[in-house]
């Protein structure tokens, strides 16, 4: 019973503290365009405070964004493609 109560309390907290992946957008609602992953790594980590980032389909895709950051709405197929980084 105690385990169940602990599970019910911890589960919502884990969802709140989780981080998300996606194309981080600026104040104009556009994701940074790119050709090189090094540019995206710097853009994601220094501008958007993500854990890392790389160039996916000519836009910077960031990993580990805070929940309050806005991301570009994309299709599930594109998201699953970009969630698997080719270059580390």
UniProtKB/Swiss-Prot annotation:
Range of residues in the leader sequence: 1-18
Domain annotation LCN-type CS-alpha/beta: ranges: 20-83
Keywords in alphabetical order: Disulfide bond, Ion channel impairing toxin, Neurotoxin, Secreted, Signal, Toxin, Voltage-gated sodium channel impairing toxin
SUPFAM superfamilies per the UniProt record, alphabetical: Scorpion toxin-like
Keyword Disulfide bond recorded: yes
Tissue: Expressed by the venom gland.
GO cellular component: extracellular region
The organism's place on the tree of life at top rank: Eukaryota
Coiled coil location: none
Keyword Glycoprotein: no
Entry's Gene Ontology molecular function annotations: sodium channel inhibitor activity; toxin activity
Disulfide bonds: 34-55, 40-60, 44-62, 56-82
SMART domains the record matches: Knot1
A biological process term (GO) from this entry: defense response
Protein location: Secreted
Chief subcellular location: secreted
Pfam families: Toxin_3 (PF00537)
Cited function: Excitatory insect beta-toxins induce a spastic paralysis. They bind voltage-independently at site-4 of sodium channels (Nav) and shift the voltage of activation toward more negative potentials thereby affecting sodium channel activation and promoting spontaneous and repetitive firing. This toxin is active only on insects.
Family of this protein: Belongs to the long (4 C-C) scorpion toxin superfamily. Sodium channel inhibitor family. Beta subfamily.
Notes concerning its domains: Has the structural arrangement of an alpha-helix connected to antiparallel beta-sheets by disulfide bonds (CS-alpha/beta).
Identification of the protein by name: Beta-insect excitatory toxin 2
């Amino acid at each position: 019973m105690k385990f169940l109560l602990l599970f019910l309390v911890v589960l919502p907290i884990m969802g709140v503290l989780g981080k998300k992946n996606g194309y981080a957008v600026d104040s104009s609602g556009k994701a940074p365009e790119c050709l090189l992953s090094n540019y995206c790594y710097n853009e994601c980590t220094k501008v958007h405070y993500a854990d890392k980032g790389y160039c996916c389909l000519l836009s910077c895709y960031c990993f580990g964004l805070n929940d309050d950051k806005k991301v570009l709405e994309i299709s599930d197929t594109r998201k699953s493609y970009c969630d698997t980084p080719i270059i580390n």
